[in-house]
Amino acid sequence: MNAEDIAQYLKVHPNFFSEHAHVLTEVYLPHPHGGRTISIGECQVLALRDKVKLLEAKLAELIQFGEDNDAVSEKVHRLGLALILARDLEGVLQSTYFNLREDFAVPHIALRLWGDFNGYSDKIEFSPVTPDLRTYAESLAHPACGPHALYDTSTWFGQDAPRLRSFATVALRGEHTFGLLALASEEAERFYPEMGTLYLKRLGELISTALLQYSSNA
């Protein structure tokens, strides 16, 4: 009889230890965290303690996740209020830059717009972009994050561009796509391909809605 036969026997006879309780007190197992031996009962207690620790760690992680989400939601709310209070396109842009830097700690922000924005075309945000970039922005269903700037967006960050290691791009759109928001950081882990982008998408929607007030054809 081998170990597998014994295991199978115990499965077939679940009442074995009820009928032979003394066996439990006579069988000793190696301690999982040391060299001594312990009884099966002690082993079960240790196993339960380990499970409890894992559950506690998971609960703490979920609580932290919820608190982090609440904090981000509050920041999004503050940006929304600032955009509502903005009195012109310049105010929308300044509120966007300020809140992203101060609340979201995004160190590098650039934005490009195209279309008719009622006399604001002299601003840097209306610098010409390539047709390929427009096509890319139109195809961007969700924010894109990763270690490389897409198309020529790295040039938007001027002399800071060479030291930037992660990027996020968010399409700005209403009925049609009319712009692109680019975020960047020196930290490689700040914007990475597998990260969740729900809040980035919400930010894009808020900023787009605020900007649309000043566009006649977006």
Model-found features: residue ranges?
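Short hydrophobic/glycine-rich mini-motifs in sensory/regulatory modules
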Residues: 172-181
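Regulatory loop-to-helix N-cap segments in sensory/regulatory domains
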Residues: 185-201, 211-218
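Acidic, low-complexity intrinsically disordered segments
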Residues: 4-50
